[in-house]
Regions:
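Glycine-rich, low-complexity intrinsically disordered segments
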Residues: 1-94, 98-132
Length: 132
């Protein structure tokens, strides 16, 4: 897979990031590589997107975690958690476009990805399938 761009955020390391999307993240900018500019046609303010990211700082060897790093919770297989540490650390983030410009920079609300996170894809969010 080839990233199409990167996230630009005030979140500088994993410890700064919310553990879940519903905990809120800061506004961020999706910096898309210029060669993909035509693919942004009709992505406008108000568009809801699913941002697919590669969680590049994740530990791909981890198979079990204490959910939310709470050792009072029993070790749980990563496929039964939302942990970013997993064999294939793909992130899915539902966001709304809040601004655009220059042509390959898109401003979005509440994105819980750290600065420099590679973006793999953008997909329009479907209201009838909230997580698709």
């Amino acid at each position: 897979m080839t990233p199409i761009g990167v996230v630009r955020s005030t979140l500088r390391d994993r410890g700064d990031a919310p553990r879940q999307a519903f905990e809120g993240g800061p506004e961020a900018t999706l910096e898309i590589d210029p060669e993909f500019a035509p693919a942004l046609d009709r992505v406008t303010v108000g568009t809801e997107l699913i941002v697919v990211t590669w969680l590049h700082e994740a530990d791909r060897t981890v198979l079990r975690v204490h959910p939310r790093d709470d050792e009072r919770i029993p070790l749980t297989g990563v496929f039964a958690t939302r942990s970013s540490d997993r064999p294939n650390p793909i992130g899915l983030h539902r966001v709304t476009v809040t601004g655009a410009g220059p042509p390959t920079r898109i401003r979005v609300d509440a994105l819980e990805a750290i600065d420099g996170t590679p973006i793999l894809d953008l997909k329009v969010a479907m209201p009838q399938a909230p997580d698709a």
